[in-house]
C-alpha cells in the first residue's frame, strides 16, 4: 500500500471514530425514518411495508423509493443491530469506499498523489459541513454517490479497452445505479452529456458507452418497476417520480386532466397531489438558492483562481485541462439539477465531488496551490466540526432513558414523532409516525408520544392527540414527560376499560 493510501486510511479512520462517538448528536428526522422504517420491518418482521410514508394517489402508504438502499440497510440491521449508531454507520462505510473509488479514479488518470494532496482530499471529503451532514444521517445519498463513482470507473475502463468484461461492468454499474435512486441516473446522464461535448474527438466511443449505460438503465428501472408492480404500487411509483420533478410535474398537470377526459377516470386526486407538492418558487428563485451553498462557492472561486493562474496565457489549454473541466461540471451541476427538478442539500454531493477531484488535481500540480487549498480545507473542516456537535434539539441520552423506562408491550400501538424511531421500534411492533403517515389509517392507539416543542412534522401527532381528546369514549392520560427534548407520553383507553 502506498503512502497516500496509508494516509487516506488513517485519516478516514480518525474521522470514522469521531463520527461514531457523535452520531447521536443529530436526532432522527423525516427522510431518515421514511427510508429506514421499511428496512427495519423487512429485517425483523419479514414484511416490506411501512408506517412512515405518505399516501400516494389515494392508496395506503407504501415506500415508492427505489429499494436498493432499503435492502442493503435491512441486511446491515440483521448483522449489526438497529441502534442509531449501528444503522447510521453504514453511511460511514459507504463514504470510506466512495473516497477510495475517487482516489482510484485519479490514479487511473496517471496521477501520483502526494501525502499532502491526499490529506487535502480526505479533509474535504470528511470534514466539510455539507458532506458531514450527508453521511451522518440515514438517507441513501452516499450509496448513490458510490455507485456513480463505480459507474465512472467502469466507463473509464471501457473507454480504455472495449472488451466483453468492460461492457458487462458498465451495464451492471448502470443497472445498480438505477436501483439506488433515479436522481443518480439523471446525474450520470448529465455527466455523459458534458463529456460528450468536451471530448469531440472521441464521440463514437462515447456513443457506444451511452448505449451500454442505457442498456443498464433499461434493466435497472424496469426491475424497480416490476418490484413496485408486484406490491401493487406501480402507479404510485410513477406518480412519486413525477411529483418531485418540477419539469415532469408541469407536464403532468397538463397531460393528466386531458388523459382523464379521454380515458374516463377521475384526475382530481392526481392533480391535487401534484399541486400540493409543486414548488411555489420561481425558476429564478430556485437558481438563487444555490448561493446558500457557501463553502462550495468559496472553494470553487479559489479553484478557478488556481486554474486561471496556471493557464493565464493559454485559454485553449485551460479548456482542455481535465481538472478545469471537472470544475466546470461541478459548477453546472446545481443549475442542471434545478432545471430538472430541485437541488436540496442532500444532492450537494453531486456538485462537491467533481469539485473535490478538481481541487486535488491542482494540488498535485502546484505546491503553492496545494498549500492554499490545505489552509482552506483545515478552515472548512474547523467549521464543519459544528455539524458533529449537538444539534440543539435535545440530549439524545435523555430520550433513550425516557423511552427505556416505559413498560411498553410488543403488541402496543404507538403514535409517535420521528425522533424516537430508533428507540421505539424494537419495543413495539406497530409504530405510526404520524408526521407523514395519514392518521385516517390508524384504527386505534394505545399510546401517543407528543413532542410539544417539535417542528412542523411533529404537529400532526399533536393534532391526532387533540382529535382523540375530543372523543368522549376515550380517556387520555399523561403518564410521563421528558425535558430537553420535550416529550410527553399519553396512554389511551376506552372509558369502560
PLM ranges: what are they?
Residues 2-4, 107-115, 162-163, 199-211, ...:
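Membrane-interface helix-loop-helix junctions at transmembrane boundaries of multi-pass membrane enzymes
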Residues 208-276, 292-299:
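Membrane-lumen/periplasm interface segments of specific transmembrane helices
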Residues 122, 149, 166-182, 218-219, ...:
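Membrane-interface alpha helices of multi-pass inner-membrane proteins
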Residues 141-147, 186, 324, 331-367:
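Hydrophobic/aromatic-rich transmembrane helices and adjacent perimembrane loops
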Residues 17-20, 35-61, 68-71:
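Extracytosolic helix-loop segments that constitute the early lumenal/periplasmic catalytic or substrate-binding loops
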Residues 23, 389-396, 404-456, 481, ...:
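Short periplasmic/luminal acceptor-recognition loop of GT-C membrane glycosyltransferases, typified by
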Residues 67-71, 79-97, 134, 138, ...:
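Loop-to-helix entry region of an early transmembrane alpha helix in multi-pass inner-membrane enzymes
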Residues 29, 133-143, 344:
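Short acidic/glycine- and proline-prone juxtamembrane loop motifs at membrane-interface regions
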Amino acid at each position: 500500500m502506498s503512502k497516500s493510501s496509508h494516509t487516506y486510511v488513517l485519516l478516514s479512520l480518525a474521522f470514522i471514530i469521531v463520527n461514531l462517538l457523535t452520531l447521536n448528536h443529530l436526532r432522527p428526522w423525516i427522510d431518515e425514518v421514511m427510508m429506514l422504517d421499511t428496512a427495519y420491518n423487512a429485517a425483523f418482521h419479514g414484511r416490506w411495508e411501512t408506517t412512515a410514508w405518505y399516501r400516494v394517489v389515494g392508496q395506503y402508504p407504501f415506500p415508492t423509493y427505489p429499494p436498493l438502499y432499503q435492502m442493503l440497510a435491512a441486511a446491515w440491521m440483521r448483522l449489526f443491530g438497529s441502534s442509531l449508531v449501528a444503522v447510521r454507520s453504514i453511511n460511514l462505510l459507504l463514504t470510506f469506499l466512495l473516497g477510495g473509488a475517487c482516489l482510484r479514479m485519479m490514479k487511473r488518470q496517471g496521477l501520483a498523489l502526494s501525502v499532502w494532496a491526499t490529506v487535502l482530499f480526505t479533509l474535504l471529503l470528511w470534514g466539510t459541513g455539507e458532506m458531514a451532514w450527508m453521511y451522518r444521517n440515514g438517507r441513501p445519498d452516499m450509496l448513490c454517490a458510490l455507485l456513480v463513482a463505480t459507474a465512472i470507473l467502469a466507463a473509464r475502463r471501457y473507454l480504455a479497452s472495449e472488451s466483453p468484461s468492460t461492457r458487462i461492468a458498465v451495464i451492471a454499474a448502470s443497472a445498480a445505479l438505477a436501483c439506488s435512486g433515479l436522481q443518480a441516473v439523471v446525474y450520470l446522464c448529465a455527466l455523459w452529456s458534458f463529456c460528450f461535448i468536451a471530448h469531440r474527438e472521441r464521440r463514437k466511443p462515447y456513443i457506444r458507452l451511452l448505449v451500454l449505460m442505457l442498456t443498464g438503465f433499461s434493466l435497472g428501472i424496469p426491475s424497480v418497476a416490476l418490484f413496485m408492480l408486484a406490491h401493487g404500487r406501480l402507479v404510485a411509483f410513477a406518480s412519486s417520480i413525477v411529483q418531485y420533478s418540477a419539469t415532469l410535474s408541469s407536464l403532468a398537470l397538463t397531460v393528466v386532466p386531458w388523459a382523464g377526459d379521454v380515458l374516463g377516470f377521475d384526475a382530481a386526486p392526481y392533480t391535487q397531489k401534484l399541486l400540493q407538492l409543486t414548488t411555489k418558487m420561481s425558476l429564478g428563485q430556485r437558481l438563487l438558492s444555490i448561493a446558500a451553498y457557501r463553502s462550495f462557492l468559496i472553494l470553487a472561486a479559489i479553484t478557478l483562481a488556481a486554474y486561471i493562474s496556471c493557464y493565464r496565457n493559454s485559454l485553449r489549454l485551460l479548456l482542455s485541462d481535465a481538472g478545469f473541466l471537472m470544475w466546470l461540471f461541478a459548477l453546472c451541476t446545481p443549475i442542471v439539477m434545478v432545471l430538472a427538478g430541485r437541488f436540496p442539500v442532500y444532492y450537494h454531493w453531486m456538485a462537491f465531488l467533481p469539485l473535490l477531484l478538481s481541487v486535488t488535481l491542482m494540488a498535485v500540480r502546484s505546491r503553492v496551490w496545494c498549500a492554499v487549498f490545505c489552509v482552506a480545507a483545515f478552515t472548512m473542516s474547523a467549521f464543519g466540526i459544528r455539524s458533529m456537535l449537538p444539534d440543539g434539539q435535545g440530549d439524545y441520552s435523555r430520550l433513550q432513558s425516557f423511552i427505556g423506562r416505559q413498560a411498553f408491550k410488543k403488541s402496543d400501538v404507538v403514535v409517535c414523532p420521528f425522533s424516537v424511531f430508533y428507540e421505539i421500534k424494537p419495543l413495539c411492533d406497530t409504530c405510526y409516525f404520524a408526521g407523514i403517515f395519514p392518521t385516517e389509517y390508524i384504527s386505534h392507539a394505545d399510546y401517543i408520544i407528543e413532542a410539544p416543542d417539535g417542528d412542523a412534522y411533529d404537529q400532526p401527532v399533536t393534532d391526532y392527540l387533540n382529535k382523540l381528546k375530543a372523543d368522549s369514549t376515550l380517556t387520555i392520560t399523561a403518564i410521563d414527560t421528558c425535558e430537553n427534548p420535550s416529550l410527553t407520553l399519553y396512554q389511551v383507553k376506552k372509558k369502560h376499560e
